[in-house]
Every structure is written in structure tokens, then in C-alpha cells.
């Protein structure tokens, strides 16, 4: 028993942003085969994407904070094109992934997961540091342009066994796996971001223009390589109303940073770590589940991106630790979940010292509570909602300078509500409201405003020549709200009101 599913993509035209052209071609094939003893899935795909204009990324000039910049300028018109003639991003890539399971007997099986993907950013003509720099409260923009290429390749392989062991009334689901991953990046030997290929100037409210723009040819060189080896063991123990997960992962990693021009290694960072994972679930009755969990992950070391003054530097490896407790309650067609979590990870932040550097300074701690409710309100009416409070702070920073300050770009409040109406089996209407609270940036010196957006859509099920089809019309950002989304210290401009039509054929 098996099947083949093919998804194709062809885009060519303007988006909801003025003079923003997008062209894309893609094809993906998912092939699967199942029999009594095995299960195999193969995914292969290719995609090419070309975007002209329509830049959304901005930043504030760090040296002007508290001087020419005393506030975050109000978001400009989202439908305007804040690019210039020649601004472009073009990429192509492919993916191959294989998953196979083979039964050895009634209780044991072995499995193989392997894959690779490659992506080449062929053209990337944008403001230096990959965004446009706002220099004052009026929204004026001034910075150099840059042109770059990036080639990324990833390889992964995992081999393991999984089986069930019964010891009296206790059931063990045991998994042992070995895995290895390879990753490499090539970058432009010269990005021409020193003004030699031109500059961009203007204002976010009236538009931007490129000045003396020149498009150089780009040659790439090896920027970084890393390798990762790991072994993991996990045991899920089930006994009556209780379930216990015990797991551990041991890894070794090596990260090499290269001089793209000479091809020589400039820095090597090796690491190894033991990361435990454990969790507990207890179901006192058919409606209620109580849970608690702890997990640890290890970052092998962040390689500083080319837009920073310390590009190519490898930041120290660091662990991310997460703890969570909560409960789930299901009754009368509703599922309610409440979780309290704590996450600690390395604090990789932007630091301005004449130029912008990426540095590791202490840790980030995320503490929060998340509530979600979904279910059937009444006949033909469904509801889903969620609310999260997040307290994200910086700790253990150098000399305590930023201790207790909010992590840049982290909003304290987020909420979503979705309402669906199904007048009959063929037709449905869905509405969604999303709220994002205000967020501090630049270590609480500035703040982005809160915003709320609304989406509205309809679905209709029909048939063309006896082939089932679902027609969908969706309007995103229904009220055409203009807003900034904070991402670290960067500002991402919202997308304008966008109408999307689609048809899904069940062949």
C-alpha cells in the first residue's frame, strides 16, 4: 500500500505591496509505501523564488538613540513600497528526506531518518546590515547598500531502534538512536557594503531611493563548517494512570569559522554535553491530565553573521533549559489547557561600540503562563482562544549593566481568538483576532506600540467533474492596520490588507 502526492507552485505577479513583484516555481513529491512490516516515506522538492522590491526590515541608528531618535517613529503606510529600483532577493534550493521503519518482530523495530537540503541566495541587494536604517524621529533613512550571496548546505542521518518491554503491569517504550549532522555556509568574499555600490536615502513616509547604484559580480567562499555527533536514549514508562518519560542525549560538536578569501580556518570551537529530558503525566480521571517536564538542549556555538563588525566569530556554546508544569481538562466538548513555563538561554545581543557587534552577555530568562481554550460553543459554532503572559529578562550581564531589563523585542502580552461558523456541511466562515502587546527595544530605551489585527475567511466544499474541491477566500489584516513588529532591536513593517484565493483538490 502506498501513494504519491505532488504539490506544485507557480507564482508570477504583484503582491498587496505597491510595485512588489514576486515570482516562484516549485515542485514537491511525497512518496510513501506501507506494508505489514515496513513504512517508508520519501520527500523530494525544489523551489525558486525571486522578489523585486517590497522591503519590510528596518532598524534604528544606535548612535542616535536618546539624541536624534527619542521614540519609535509611527509605522508608515504598509502598502507602500519601501525599496528602490534594483532591490531584489532571489534564491533557489532543494530538499531530499527519507524516513524508514522496519519491524523486526511484534515488539521491536529499527528506523532510519536521513536527508539533505541546499539553498543558494543568488541575489540579495538591500541596505547594509540587511535592513534600512532610520536616523531620526522624522523617519529619515540613510545607509549604504550591499550585495551578497549565501550558499547553505545541510546533511543529516539517524539510525535507531525502538521497542516495547513489559515488566508486570508496567510498559516501557524504549528508543536508542545515533545521529550525525553536517552544516556548511558559503558567503560573499566582498559584500561591497562600504558605499562602493551606492547608498539609499529618503524617508519612510515619502519613499526611498537608491543613489549611484552599481551591481557587482559576487564570488563566494567558505564561511563556516560544523559537525555534530550524538547518541540518545529515551524510555516512556506507562503504569495505570501515570506516564513517565526519562531521556538523555550526549553529543559532541565542532564548529570551524573560515576566512572567505584565503580559505583558512580562523577559529575552531569544540563542545560536548549531556542533556537530560524528563516528564511526568498523571490522569486522575478521564477528563483531567496533570503534567510536568524538564528539557535541555545544547547550542554548539553561534557564528556571528556577516552584517556585524565581528563577523565570523564563534560565540560560546551554551545550554537552553526549559521547565514546565500544567494541566489539561476536557469536558462537554471543550479542551482547556494551562501551562506555566521557565526557559533560560544564552543572551546573544547587539552591542554598539562605534560599529554594531553581536556578543554573548549573560542569559535570557523567559517566565510565563499560557492559557488556551477550544471547543464547540453551540450547534454550528466553534471557538479557539489563547492568552500568554511573558516576563522576559536579562540576567548575569557584564557588571550587571542590563540585569533585570526586558529582552529586546519580547512583548509581555499575546492573545488570539478564532470563531468559526458552519451553517451547513459545505460552507464555513472563520474570523480571527490577534493581539500583540508593546515591546521594549534597545534595553528599554524605546518601545514599540501594541497592535491588534483581524482576519476573515470563507471555505466552500464542492466538486469539479466528481473531484472534491475546497474553495477558500481569506482576507488578512482586514482593517489594513499599519504597525511595527519588534524582532530583537529590528523593526518589521506589517503587510497590508491581503486577499488570498485558493482551491484544494482531493484527487
Where do the PLM segments sit?
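Transmembrane beta-barrel wall of Gram-negative outer-membrane proteins
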Residues: 1-60, 88-99
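Repeated loop/turn-to-beta-strand initiation elements of outer-membrane beta-barrel proteins
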Residues: 2-4, 37-42, 107-110, 169, ...
